[in-house]
Each structure stands twice: as structure tokens, then as C-alpha cells.
Amino acid sequence: MYRWKRCLLTGLMALVISCSTALMVNAQEQFVVLSGTELTRVVPPGFYFQGLTAPTQMRNSSAARFGANRYVIAGLVDTSGYAADVRAKYEGFLITDSAITINGTELGTGAYGFGFSNDGKLNILDLAGNQILSVSTTKDSAMKRPRPLMMTKVADGVRFYNGRDYALIAIK
């Protein structure tokens, strides 16, 4: 009888440990969209792109944290100092300190420029202005108050919005 209770107790402990470990791993991988002082702490005041530094529009910035200290940060910048051809493709910056996917396409760790095009694409550019990724966006016609840039948490990641158009960012 004693042996049976010991086996049962050991089995229950193993089950509790495995379930709690799974919950901890899941909690570490969840996105949290930052706001307030948490947001201002991680968003840079300016961003370098194609030979110039432009100030960040803090009201049009957003960031998400996943895990203990992994971030995806985005913001629109004042592009008035850039040439017209650069302004046509570059709206802001996207910084990620871990590999992510955007609509299922992998993007490595780094700092990038981005722009949403009129034909429903999100274009990711390296700091020299070369396009390295282009994905189709989805229109969210149910959104009541679109903003120029924002992130919202969903079950499988974060929606990265420009107005009503969005792309899904997920951890890799």
C-alpha cells in the first residue's frame, strides 16, 4: 500500500511540474503591448535611415514585449528632410531584438525602415533603403478609430497597423 501511494504521489508531482512549466513557457512567449512610461523607455527619440536622422513621432509609436525582455518597436518619423522618392517608401522604423515573422515571412534581428504602400503592402527596408521584405496587408474594416500606427494583441501575435491596414507580427 505504501509503495502504491508513493508512486501516485510521484506521478502527481511530475504532472504538476510539467503543467506549470508549460504554462510558464506560454506566459513568457505572450506579447504585451506597451504604453506610458514603459513605451517611452524603449522607443528611440530619433532614427537613422539613408544618411539622415529623423525625429520619432512619439504619439505614433508602439512597442510590444514578449518574454522577459524581447521587444518589437515601431514608430513613424518626421520625413520632411528626405528626398521625395525616399518619403514615398519610408514612413518609420521597426526594431526587433529577436527573430520574428511578419505575415509568416521571417525577419531577423535588426533595425529597419518600413512603409505601407497604397497597393496594400508592408515594405521592410534595410538602413540603406533597399527593400528586403514585402508582405500583403489585411484591411480591418471593423476598426472604429484607426490611427496612423499602432499595435494590438491577438491570440497568435500582434497586429501592426497603419490606419486600417495591418500585418501580423509573431515570434519565431
Language model region names:
Residues 23-85, 134-172:
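Primarily secretory-pathway and cell-envelope proteins
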Residues 1-12:
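Bacterial N-terminal signal peptides that target proteins for export
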Residues 122-139:
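Short, solvent-exposed cationic patches
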Residues 3, 21-23:
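Intrinsically disordered, low-complexity serine/threonine-rich segments
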Residues 10-20:
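Bacterial N-terminal signal peptides
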